[in-house]
Amino acid sequence: MPVQPPSKDTEEMEAEGDSAAEMNGEEEESEEERSGSQTESEEESSEMDDEDYERRRSECVSEMLDLEKQFSELKEKLFRERLSQLRLRLEEVGAERAPEYTEPLGGLQRSLKIRIQVAGIYKGFCLDVIRNKYECELQGAKQHLESEKLLLYDTLQGELQERIQRLEEDRQSLDLSSEWWDDKLHARGSSRSWDSLPPSKRKKAPLVSGPYIVYMLQEIDILEDWTAIKKARAAVSPQKRKSDGP
């Protein structure tokens, strides 16, 4: 059999195999180079990281100090501003110009006016009550005075009438006793001239109709008893009047 020449496909496959082997070798070399460069870069980066860390730390510390200084300055400035504002508001309050003072003050003044009006109305009512009470007390006092005056007048009138009655009774008793004594004396003096009088001028004995009481007492005793009875009646009559009264 004749020998056939190799086909193009086989040649291409061999060429691809050679190129793949070459590429694998190159890749291995590149990986070794990269690993070496990485180690070198890591060493360099570690040295750079320490320096960068120190540099950044110093920068951060300086920035922090700067910020603290700015904060303290701002705080002091804010304190001064707030203090000046408070002083200004205090001056406005002292001059009665601050709104936070004038608005409540207006409310207080309005409430003061209302309370003054209410107090005036209450005062008027209280004065009316006191005036009415005074008039009632005055009227009651006048009525009490009038009643006491009438009672005193009645009492004095009764006492005076009793005294007058007693005086009248005493006067009558004295008149009777004096008449009796006069009659006695006249009877003793004129007993002798009785017979000498004419019959026309002699007193006739009184005619008594009905029962005739013969007193066994003497005339002086009868007169004393009659006077005692009159005085007893006069003493009993005011007591009876007081018991019958209101």
Swiss-Prot record:
The keyword Lipid metabolism does not apply. Expression levels are higher in term placentas than in early placentas. Low levels of expression observed in normal pregnancies and in molar pregnancies. Homohexamer (Potential). Interacts with SNX6, HDAC1 and RELA. Interacts with ARID4A. Identified in mSin3A corepressor complexes together with SIN3A, SIN3B, RBBP4, RBBP7, SAP30, SUDS3, ARID4A, HDAC1 and HDAC2. Interacts with SPOP; this recruits the protein to a ubiquitin ligase complex containing SPOP and CUL3. Contains an N-terminal anti-parallel coiled coil formed by two BRMS1 chains; this region can form homohexamers. It is found in: Nucleus; Cytoplasm. Keywords: Apoptosis, Coiled coil, Cytoplasm, Isopeptide bond, Nucleus, Repressor, Transcription, Transcription regulation, Tumor suppressor, Ubl conjugation. Residues 1-57 are annotated as: Disordered. This is Breast cancer metastasis-suppressor 1. Ubiquitinated by a cullin-RING-based BCR (BTB-CUL3-RBX1) E3 ubiquitin-protein ligase complex containing SPOP, leading to proteasomal degradation. Belongs to the BRMS1 family. Residues 51-98 form a coiled coil. GO terms for cellular component: cytoplasm; nucleoplasm; nucleus; Sin3-type complex. It comes from the Eukaryota. There is a cross-link at K184, K242 (Glycyl lysine isopeptide (Lys-Gly) (interchain with G-Cter in SUMO2)). Its main location: nucleus. Transcriptional repressor. Down-regulates transcription activation by NF-kappa-B by promoting the deacetylation of RELA at 'Lys-310'. Promotes HDAC1 binding to promoter regions. Down-regulates expression of anti-apoptotic genes that are controlled by NF-kappa-B. Promotes apoptosis in cells that have inadequate adherence to a substrate, a process called anoikis, and may thereby inhibit metastasis. May be a mediator of metastasis suppression in breast carcinoma. GO terms for biological process: apoptotic process; negative regulation of cell migration; negative regulation of DNA-templated transcription; negative regulation of NF-kappaB transcription factor activity; negative regulation of stem cell population maintenance; negative regulation of transcription by RNA polymerase II; negative regulation of transforming growth factor beta receptor signaling pathway; positive regulation of anoikis.
